[in-house]
Amino acid sequence: MESTEQPRNISGSMQSPRSPSSHPYLSVSVTDPVKLGNGVQAYISYRVITKTNLPEYQGPEKIVIRRYSDFVWLRDRLFEKYKGIFIPPLPEKSAVEKFRFSAEFIEMRRAALDIFVNRIALHPELQQSEDLRTFLQADEETMDRFRFQETSIFKKPADLMQMFRDVQSKVSDAVLGKEKPVEETTADYEKLKHYIFELENHLTEAQKHAYRLVKRHRELGQSLLDFGKAVKLLGACEGEPTGKAFSDLGTKSELLSIKLQKEAQQVLMNFEEPLKDYVRYVQSIKATIAERGTAFKQHCELSETTKLKEINLDKLMLTRSDKVGEAEIEYREIKAESEEATRRFERIVKRMEDEIVRFQEQKTEEMGVAFHQFAKGQARLANSVADAWRSLLPKLEASYSV
């Protein structure tokens, strides 16, 4: 299946096909899902088509094959490297094995993966990522090697040391009675957290009701189909004109059943799925908030440790201790760590300030489109249903007026 999506420039607006090189653009399409393998080893592969005029890419178009775990690799790499940025969410795996390879699930996941990678490609910082270029251009063997290295426990010894330090710190806090967590309490930060947690609740509730709407449309469609068949059989037992009227009623019910099933699919893809996507997005933002909390804690703890080291150094200098040299080295090292932790925390805060504005603008636009499509679809369905039943009235009236 050939992609028909027009290139987008890096600000996210549509690029004119007549002047593809007038502005920098990076457009990605996730297409052609194919099931590979059997049993528990089975998975879906996708063609990822990249079109760009950015000089750091290998050419104007590149096609690679990717699987879900490759998208996970990209998300994890970006989350690790771009602290403070709201990394777009991935669609979740199917919790029910029998639905893993259903046509509906595969299409929903393909669409969600397409949204995921294009959000990254359109982000002013993320679109410059070396990992994104690797994901969009590397051959399958290279991609497998990167993914394997990422999952190896020996890949990140620094992470293991950090885990050890965290455990050591928690044990020390417990012994010293300092178990109360260090938390940021500024008014802006509290306002942000309140907004995100409230937004998650409201989106989750809206998505739950959208799911019920899809279910209701499908059930009503099935009921109309069953009713149409039953009325046709009933009409076959009747003479004219009643039999013909019943047959027309059954046919019309079956046609309306098809319309309801189609509308159910539209509500699912264009309304429920965008709501579900934004629930995942908010959960991704909560992960960034947690990272900010960790950075703030490190900033505070290292700042406190630096003060203690400075006090200890001053005492040793007063007593002319032979440990002054060693203490001075320790103080300089911990001070450098503290300053880096402060810069890291401040960078996260600044990024999040920019990100929340960007997120709200994006949410307003995308949710506005979703609600507009939903309302338009419901109006169209209501008109179709009313017209269908209205067209039957003269025939039904004639059947009992004879």
UniProtKB/Swiss-Prot annotation:
Q: Which UniProt keyword terms apply here?
A: Cytoplasm, Endosome, Golgi apparatus, Lipid-binding, Membrane, Phosphoprotein, Protein transport, Transport
Domain BAR: residue ranges: 160-402
**Sites of the modification Phosphoserine?**
S16
Coiled-coil region: none
Which ranges carry the PX domain?
24-143
The membrane-topology field of this record reads: Peripheral membrane protein
**PROSITE patterns listed in its UniProt record:** PX
Q: Per the record, which residues fall in region Disordered?
A: 1-25
Detail which positions bind a 1,2-diacyl-sn-glycero-3-phospho-(1D-myo-inositol-3-phosphate): R67, K93, R109
Domain of life of the organism encoding this protein: Eukaryota
Which CDD domains does this chain map to? Answer: BAR_SNX, PX_SNX1_2_like
Q: Where in the cell is it found?
A: Cytoplasm; Endosome membrane; Prevacuolar compartment membrane; Golgi apparatus, trans-Golgi network membrane
Query: Which SMART domains did the record assign?
Result: PX
Q: Which Pfam families match?
A: PX, Vps5
Q: Where is the composition biased (Low complexity)?
A: 11-24
**Chief localisation class:** cytoplasm
Q: Where is the composition biased (Polar residues)?
A: 1-10
One GO BP on record is: endosome to lysosome transport
**Tissue expression from the record:** Ubiquitously expressed.
Spell out the subunit comment. Answer: Homodimer. Heterodimer with SNX2A or SNX2B. Component of the retromer complex which consists of VPS29 (MAG1), VPS26 (VPS26A or VPS26B), VPS35 (VPS35A or VPS35B or VPS35C), VPS5/17 (SNX1 or SNX2A or SNX2B). Interacts with BLOS1 and BLOS2.
The name this protein goes by in its record: Sorting nexin 1
